[in-house]
């Protein structure tokens, strides 16, 4: 019999935990947000608050890989033709200093395939680890993330990345 939590329901609620049925999801740890010459910095943001967590994210990733936990990565990345960028999102980005798709030191900002969408080296995906490009905050909207998780028979998610009150929270909800 599984232990009870306050006599209300069995714990763990969803049955025994398994690393193979749990995925680590690394959210938006890409150069456009982390690099001093990336999109976030160009809009007046300070990427040091993001780069400061890189060592801890790298430790979590290393541990997950050691125990055989599948690892997934997300990036905020738009189509080169900008067809998935709502006008209001583009308006906000331009007001901050650089619109989505505008050229910068890392290529066109937040565009799939550009250098700014590369995940930071200390936590770069290994061959076979999926990278989910998403045009918004949630990895479940306008992407194949749900299908990838179902195909891998993932039942539980562990999150690391940026920002907790943005893309991380939107994805976990």
Give residue ranges: language-model regions:
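Structural motif
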Residues: 74, 160-162
